[in-house]
Structure formats: structure tokens, C-alpha cells
């Protein structure tokens, strides 16, 4: 046995402390992931769609496709 | 003469009884595997049986001393009592090992061996790929997809520059 006396370790509340710490980390991580998703994926996609349709001319698009020859009903 | 005859009868009875009891003992005695076993487990900190079953003479003496006040026990005696009761300490039973290196190495070896098998299969078993995998076919296919403006917002056609007729930088 070691000559010096070790400090008495924590005897109680071990599970409670573990749960508390994990809750905090889980909360922070979830918020972080949600924020990252909102800004980098959701908002970016909404902006891409808005930008695409702002000045979208469907007839011009159709004419380009028709000239490229992909349709069977209209040449 | 009669007394000895009677005594020998009684003696015989006693002997045969004790023989029966002894025989019965070995039949009824529990096998080792049906009794609780000693285990070193984190989730079973105090097993039902001690680690050392058969104590030596000095250990028996120590167990007798344990019945008195414990402050009279020396440090070594306390450790000896601990080692009688338990095989490994928690620190010892929880120690890490290098087994993971064997596991990872073995897994990678067998994955590599599987790769060799697949290479052999590609060469000697599988037939040719369909024509839709040819470079020219894929080029014509991609051109048609761009003409149709497939996924023009975030997908394929959004990566094509229709003015310069090339992929966007």
C-alpha cells in the first residue's frame, strides 16, 4: 500500500453527474447540428430556388429544349 | 462370546450405515459447475465465493486473526486477505490490451484477400459490361440530359454553362 493517504473518491451521484454532463453535451451538439443544417443546407437551397425562378422564362427554356431535339411530340 | 457376536452385528450395521452415508454423500454432493463460480466482473463486484477455495495453514491462521480487531493486521496481511477473496483488482481486470491491433490487422488482411478474389472474378468469371457503359454512349447520354435540363437548380444542369458550352468552373 502507498505510504500517503489517497483522497476519498466520489461515492455517490455518479450516474446523475454522468447524465447531467451528457445532457449538456447532447443539447449543445444538437443545437449546433440543427443550426449548421439550417444555414448551410436549408437556407442555401431556398436561395438557389428563389434565384432560379426570379427571372425564369419558361417559353425560352422550352424553345431551347425543342431546338436540341429531345421532344417526340414537337420538333 | 454372545456379546462379541452381538457387537459384531451392531458393528456391521454401523459400518454398513456409515458406508451408505458416505456413498450417499458422493452422490448428493453438488458438482463444481452447479455452484456459484468466482468471476472478475465490473458489474458483479462481490462474487458469492472467494477466489481461494482451499486455504493453506498460514492462510487459515490469517483468517482466524481476521476475526479479531482489524487494526492489529499489518498492511501485508490486509493485502493477503484481499488476494484470498479476490483474484484481480478492479484496476487489473480493467486494464487495456493490444488486442485491437490484432483485430484491425486481421480484418484488413481479409478485406485485402477479398479484393484479390474479386479481381480474379472480374478477369475470369464476369462477362463484358453492357454498351451503355462505353465512353461515347455516356457522353451522348450526358449531352441529352443537359439538353433536357435535368435538375437545373442544384443538380446536373446547374453545373453546365449554357453560354460557353462547357462545365462551370
Curated annotation (Swiss-Prot), chain A:
Q: Which domain of life is it from?
A: Eukaryota
- What quaternary arrangement does the UniProt entry report? Component of the cytochrome c oxidase (complex IV, CIV), a multisubunit enzyme composed of 14 subunits. The complex is composed of a catalytic core of 3 subunits MT-CO1, MT-CO2 and MT-CO3, encoded in the mitochondrial DNA, and 11 supernumerary subunits COX4I, COX5A, COX5B, COX6A, COX6B, COX6C, COX7A, COX7B, COX7C, COX8 and NDUFA4, which are encoded in the nuclear genome.
**Membrane-side (Mitochondrial matrix) residue stretches:** 1-13
Q: In which pathway does it act?
A: Energy metabolism; oxidative phosphorylation
Q: Where would you find the membrane-spanning parts of this chain?
A: 14-54
Q: Which UniProt keywords apply?
A: Membrane, Mitochondrion, Mitochondrion inner membrane, Transmembrane, Transmembrane helix
Give the organism the record lists. Pongo pygmaeus (Bornean orangutan)
Q: What does this protein do?
A: Component of the cytochrome c oxidase, the last enzyme in the mitochondrial electron transport chain which drives oxidative phosphorylation. The respiratory chain contains 3 multisubunit complexes succinate dehydrogenase (complex II, CII), ubiquinol-cytochrome c oxidoreductase (cytochrome b-c1 complex, complex III, CIII) and cytochrome c oxidase (complex IV, CIV), that cooperate to transfer electrons derived from NADH and succinate to molecular oxygen, creating an electrochemical gradient over the inner membrane that drives transmembrane transport and the ATP synthase.
Gene expressing this chain: COX6C
The protein's name is Cytochrome c oxidase subunit 6C
* Keyword Ubl conjugation tagged: no
Q: What would be one Gene Ontology cellular-component term for the protein?
A: mitochondrial inner membrane
Q: How the protein sits in the membrane?
A: Single-pass membrane protein
GO biological process per UniProt:
oxidative phosphorylation
Q: What family is this?
A: Belongs to the cytochrome c oxidase subunit 6c family.
Q: Which Pfam families match?
A: COX6C
Q: Where in the cell is it found?
A: Mitochondrion inner membrane
Q: Which residues point to the Mitochondrial intermembrane side?
A: 55-75
Q: Gene3D superfamilies, per this entry?
A: Mitochondrial cytochrome c oxidase subunit VIc/VIIs
Amino acid at each position: 500500500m502507498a505510504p500517503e493517504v489517497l483522497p476519498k473518491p466520489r461515492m455517490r451521484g455518479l450516474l446523475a453527474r454522468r447524465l447531467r454532463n451528457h445532457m449538456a453535451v447532447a443539447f449543445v451538439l444538437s443545437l449546433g447540428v440543427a443550426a449548421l443544417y439550417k444555414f448551410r443546407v436549408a437556407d442555401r437551397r431556398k436561395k438557389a430556388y428563389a434565384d432560379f425562378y426570379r427571372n425564369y422564362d419558361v417559353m425560352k427554356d422550352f424553345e431551347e429544349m425543342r431546338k436540341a431535339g429531345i421532344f417526340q411530340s414537337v420538333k | 462370546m454372545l456379546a462379541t457376536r452381538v457387537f459384531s452385528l451392531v458393528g456391521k450395521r454401523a459400518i454398513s450405515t456409515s458406508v451408505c452415508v458416505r456413498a450417499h454423500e458422493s452422490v448428493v454432493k453438488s458438482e463444481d459447475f452447479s455452484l456459484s463460480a468466482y468471476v472478475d466482473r465490473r458489474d458483479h463486484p462481490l462474487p458469492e465465493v472467494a477466489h481461494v477455495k482451499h486455504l493453506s495453514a498460514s492462510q487459515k491462521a490469517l483468517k482466524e486473526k481476521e476475526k479479531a480487531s482489524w487494526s492489529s493486521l499489518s498492511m501485508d496481511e490486509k493485502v493477503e486477505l484481499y488476494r484470498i477473496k479476490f483474484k484481480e483488482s478492479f484496476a487489473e481486470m480493467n486494464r487495456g490490451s493490444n488486442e485491437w491491433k490484432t483485430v484491425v490487422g486481421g480484418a484488413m488482411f481479409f478485406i485485402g484477400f477479398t479484393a484479390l478474389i474479386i479481381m480474379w472474378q472480374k478477369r475470369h468469371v464476369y462477362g463484358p459490361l453492357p454498351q451503355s457503359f462505353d465512353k461515347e454512349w455516356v457522353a451522348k447520354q450526358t449531352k441529352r440530359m443537359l439538353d433536357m435540363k435535368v435538375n437545373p437548380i442544384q443538380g446536373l444542369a446547374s453545373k453546365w454553362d449554357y453560354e460557353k458550352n462547357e462545365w462551370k468552373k
